[in-house]
């Protein structure tokens, strides 16, 4: 994206979805000081409300000076500062379809040398630069547009309403209060009694708990928006493909009694309990000299690294043996994992070793016995059991800055513990406040802002 825009430019773009190609209405948005005049050049209207702010009126798009009309439109005018961008904004509501809306946009641009096509996210960027929204609200708008499920949309909308900023400002105000007390002591030390380190540490602990809760929620709501990738891992013929078919409610993978039937990765996207999940069926892991099967097994280990969650499946008929233990040792310790003992219908569960039962979900995939328990276990281990308590969506940028702030606060603990110079507390608190300010967009470079908004769609 180009460098930060100036209000000398007037920008235009299609603001409605056109990927399907057809629709009842398509919208062109125009923003800038020439927005109204540029639209007047291509619109003919007899409405008495024409070009008044916050009025909708009817008009016709004129292709040339011979009064050839190509579409009948509704025009909505929003004059500065009472618009999304804070500038003069005009919206042309055309008939839907790629052909007509592209033609209207082309006529608008060709008749106005001071109007150019908007860059991705440029309308939202102008709204941010003009103080109409903070950066978290702008990002939440983009998140809302790209929401993959209803719960993700709810979280994004809370950000649009300013809920992220409220939480960040609350933490920031706590730190500002601590900073004021410390800097007053540094500047006017003779006017203060001994500093109450215990009280300070208690206050900072409360702030850290707020940040840690936000960070923990950020990891959970990433699952809500992006989904949980779940790899089905195990030896051959333990029921991985059967479990994939059960969860998908249709036959996605071939199931036979022949070991090594699944030789490649099969992925299925599902939504379970309003949470998107990608179930990945992998080749059974075993010693083999068959080249194609070996490639599939290598891919299985690759999917272990890529996935958020591992379901390790073994056969209760065979029991959990040394070969299973060896495979599980290859799974990184930080991975979320649950162990599933399949084929419970073929054995007497009373004969299973009690230590084995402690960490195993018993299931008969063939008889659909245990599916609910498996799903509940996945949701619980991913921290999504109380998903209704997660009320904002935090992205990776927010998480990075929150983690940096938490690191600053941990450093203040070390300063006190090691009896380092008192003014170092002030430095760390200032850095922590600055990291929080970056979240809402108060401490960001132009280059970083450009990068953030370039990920938005063109009409937003």
Swiss-Prot record:
Subunit note: Homodimer. Heterotetramer of two MnmE and two MnmG subunits.
Sequence positions that bind GTP: 237-242, 256-262, 281-284
Q: Where in the cell is it found?
A: Cytoplasm
Q: Please report the stretch or stretches of sequence annotated as the TrmE-type G domain.
A: 227-383
Q: Does the keyword Nucleotide-binding apply?
A: yes
GO molecular-function annotation terms?
GTP binding; GTPase activity; metal ion binding
Ligand binding (Mg(2+)): 241, 262
**What species was this sequence derived from?**
Prochlorococcus marinus (strain AS9601)
State the name under which the record lists this protein.
tRNA modification GTPase MnmE
Query: What family, per the record?
Result: Belongs to the TRAFAC class TrmE-Era-EngA-EngB-Septin-like GTPase superfamily. TrmE GTPase family.
- Binding site residues for (6S)-5-formyl-5,6,7,8-tetrahydrofolate: 29, 91, 132, 460
Q: Name one GO biological process term.
A: tRNA wobble uridine modification
Q: What does UniProt list as this organism's lineage?
A: Bacteria, Bacillati, Cyanobacteriota, Cyanophyceae, Synechococcales
Gene Ontology cellular component annotations, sorted alphabetically: cytosol
Q: Which residues form the signal peptide?
A: none
Q: Which gene encodes it?
A: mnmE
């Amino acid at each position: 994206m180009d460098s930060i825009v100036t209000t000398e430019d007037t920008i235009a773009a299609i603001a409605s979805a056109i990927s399907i190609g057809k629709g009842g209405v398509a919208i062109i948005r125009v923003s800038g000081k020439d927005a109204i005049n540029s639209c007047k050049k291509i619109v003919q209207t007899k409405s008495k409300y024409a070009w008044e702010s916050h009025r909708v009126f009817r008009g016709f798009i004129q292709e040339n000076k011979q009064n050839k009309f190509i579409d009948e439109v509704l025009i909505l005018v929003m004059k500065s500062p009472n618009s999304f961008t804070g500038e003069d904004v005009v919206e042309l509501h055309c008939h839907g379809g790629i052909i007509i809306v592209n033609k209207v946009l082309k006529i608008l641009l060709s008749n106005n040398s001071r109007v150019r096509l908007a860059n991705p996210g440029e309308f939202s960027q102008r709204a941010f630069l003009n103080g109409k929204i903070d950066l978290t609200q702008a990002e939440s708008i983009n998140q809302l547009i790209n929401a993959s499920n209803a719960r993700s949309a709810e979280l994004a909308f809370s950000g649009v309403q300013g809920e992220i900023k409220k939480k960040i400002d609350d933490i920031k105000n706590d730190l500002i209060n601590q900073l004021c007390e410390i800097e007053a002591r540094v500047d006017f030390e003779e006017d203060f009694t001994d500093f109450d380190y215990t009280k300070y540490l208690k206050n900072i602990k409360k702030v850290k708990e707020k940040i840690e809760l936000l960070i923990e929620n950020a990891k959970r709501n990433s699952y809500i928006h992006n989904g949980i990738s779940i790899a089905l891992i195990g030896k051959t013929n333990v029921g991985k493909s059967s479990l994939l078919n059960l969860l998908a409610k249709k036959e996605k993978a071939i199931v036979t009694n022949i070991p090594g039937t699944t030789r490649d990765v099969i992925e299925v996207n599902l939504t379970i309990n309003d949470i998107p999940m990608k179930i990945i069926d992998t080749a059974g892991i075993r010693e083999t000299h068959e080249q194609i099967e070996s490639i599939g097994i290598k891919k299985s280990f690759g999917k272990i690294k890529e996935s958020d969650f591992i379901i390790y499946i073994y056969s209760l008929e065979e029991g959990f043996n040394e070969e299973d233990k060896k495979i599980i040792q290859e799974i990184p310790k930080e991975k979320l994992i649950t162990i599933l003992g399949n084929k419970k219908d073929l054995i007497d569960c009373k004969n299973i070793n009690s230590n084995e039962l402690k960490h195993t979900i018993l299931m008969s995939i063939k008889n659909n016995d245990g599916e609910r328990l498996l799903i509940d276990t996945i949701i619980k281990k991913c921290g999504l059991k109380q998903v209704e308590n997660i009320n904002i969506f935090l992205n990776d940028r927010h998480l990075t800055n929150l983690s940096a702030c938490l690191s600053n606060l941990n450093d203040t603990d070390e300063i006190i513990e090691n009896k380092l110079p008192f003014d170092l507390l002030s430095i760390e608190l200032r850095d922590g406040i600055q990291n929080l300010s970056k979240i809402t967009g108060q401490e960001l470079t132009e280059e970083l802002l450009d990068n953030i908004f370039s990920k938005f769609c063109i009409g937003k």
